[in-house]
Amino acid sequence: VGSEMCIRDSQFLYSILAEEKCQEAGVEIAYYEFPTALTQTENGWQVDCMGFGTKRRVICKQIVDCTGGAEVVGLLGLERLRGEERQPGSYLFKIGDPHNPASSQLRRLYVHGADSTNSRTVTLANLTGRKTILSRVRNSKERLMHLQPETGFRESFRIIGDTVITVQDYTSGRHFEDAVSYAFYPVDLHTRTGVKPKPLKRGIVPTVPLSSLIPKGSKNIIVAGRCISSDRLANSALRVQAACMGMGQAAGATAALAAQNKTTPSSVPLDKIHGLLREHNAIVPEKS
């Protein structure tokens, strides 16, 4: 209590361990496939997906959209929100001495105007970032030691849910009646001149309500991650990994319960969601 701790992990090892857990649970992983059309059925959804050399039709009861920009929500024609101005993306890389790898520090390059709307805008952001990094490598005469595969995007489309989390909700640590997970990060809006995080006051722990994860007017779909229903400043804090993990676990539990009980995510009793989350060792919001 009263101290801060940063836990660093290996993104590469984490991804392999996550794959292992999914496969142990019977999940069929389908990399490189994307939904192209969705049809609502009497019992849920028909989802047509396509990848290179593959086509697949998935019949399911519930959808969890974790695409970052609410791409599935957009395919359904449900309302999404995005401002004209976007935070810069970041491209992570290392340049240094290959004979002294400890001397090379991870660097972050701002990619201004980075837009994750579609494949063409993502391609443009990646080309822009890599061009600048190549220029730095040439000028420094150092070795490029590491390069992330693509630009990291901070901001994209957000859904509009029955609850829109405001920055006041976030910074005051409002406990929503339908809270399903926690967040913790400072308000962290990046601009062309940099970023000045606004830390939360000691003891303030924001919550994420279920109603901010369900698109308004929808049925049998829930989201998790950066596309949560929130204003821009609140979203700048909610978009980070730990908060997204909590949302994902809550959304998955809600979707599973909805499928098992032949109901919709918004109709699942909150105590059932909390109970299932606790079974899987999630940290469940409680009123102080």
Segments predicted by a language model, with ranges:
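Flavin (FAD/FMN)-binding glycine-rich loop and adjacent Rossmann-like elements that form
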Residues: 3, 15, 32, 50-62, ...
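N-terminal cofactor/phosphate-binding cores enriched in small/glycine residues
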Residues: 12, 22-23, 35
